[in-house]
């Protein structure tokens, strides 16, 4: 967007000082651009507004509103929403109150901006989700000279109902949106979302899957679909991203070595790393299907007497007390073992060289004689501390409460038994570079894995499989995710390119689990050379999802919004 619009493109957002410290660069001297003049005008009106650059790719200009300073206005804002739109805001939680304050700041800013600039050229405001759009309906009602485009990346009711109602898609046409909103106590959110969709000049959503929800819950079919993309950075040579895979796989192997090898060992050269990640929505994100398929995969591999091992990482966010002490200790002892072995290696190497250079015969020296008693004793003690009779933990943290993932693993006996070919590592915290277990950021972790697994039941788009594709990692998705549905529309040979789509629309849960287990088993049986070739093929299609190519969908939406604003 910055490439196309330059100085005429800027973003509006809430101001959070802690985040702004590392992601925001203020412009201290306000420029004379329409955005800068509008900031000055809002400050004169008494609002606390920050203006500067967002420190991401493209470095777009951004206007940030300090919603915390606006709380004295909350009652008036709620009264006006009821008077003008009949939006009920009684007893709303603080997060909703913050969105109402932010929405009002956006309304005030855009009204002032239109007065300043709309006479000279077309102005389009692109709203993403209901959290930004509580003021949209009033902008339309007041006939502010701005084209209004509203994009929903999911629906509030869809997310709640898909998680709690069986056969959500079969029952979708028959839901009463208002009744369901009251049932889940999200009347304010659902009403803002619905009115924003109806009052925008253009409504878009991220997939055909979500478009069907919009018709039922928002009372309007989207004018067009605007697929999500990423800023794709391609390497000049194929071997570069393959080398990164090897580099980060070795880091993951360090964790696996420390986590599993105190109990038992397996061949790391014949080990594959699968992962799934996302917010904790047990059925929506397909964790239930993933675990069921893994249990079946484990049975298939054991029955086939395979010497391959699959380590499955489940990365999500759940409340926990701390990392399990035993898991941390294993990692610490591994570091101690490595340090001891490195010291012995250095000592033996130096003494072997001197003994060989000074020797008069051609006999191989006894290497044991080159190791000091201190290092022998230290190695022996470290090994004794290292080894254990306990099974490797299948969850890395001490959870506040047990959850569906833990319960399934216990019931299915998928608890890292030595004979099992599928090992589970449930990591209930998002991965970052400060993580003591991996020392990788999320993108590096993804590159080090062999397969991403995301057979979602409710996923309006699905960034996680897309993040795999742009990093050259094969992925599993579903036809109920926006990404999977889009892939099936634009590509015939997607499976050959490393994108596996599970049929969840017309299959039962059991049938989908069988299909997924077969896909995973087929992947495990692939030769290393075939996996390398597949990584090349999946990385080659990443340009399809670059914003450079997908921005045109938003360009079309904005052009249409401006035409409708001034017919």
Annotate the PLM regions.
Residues 2-567:
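Catalytic cores of nucleotide-sugar-dependent glycosyltransferases that transfer UDP/GDP/TDP-activated
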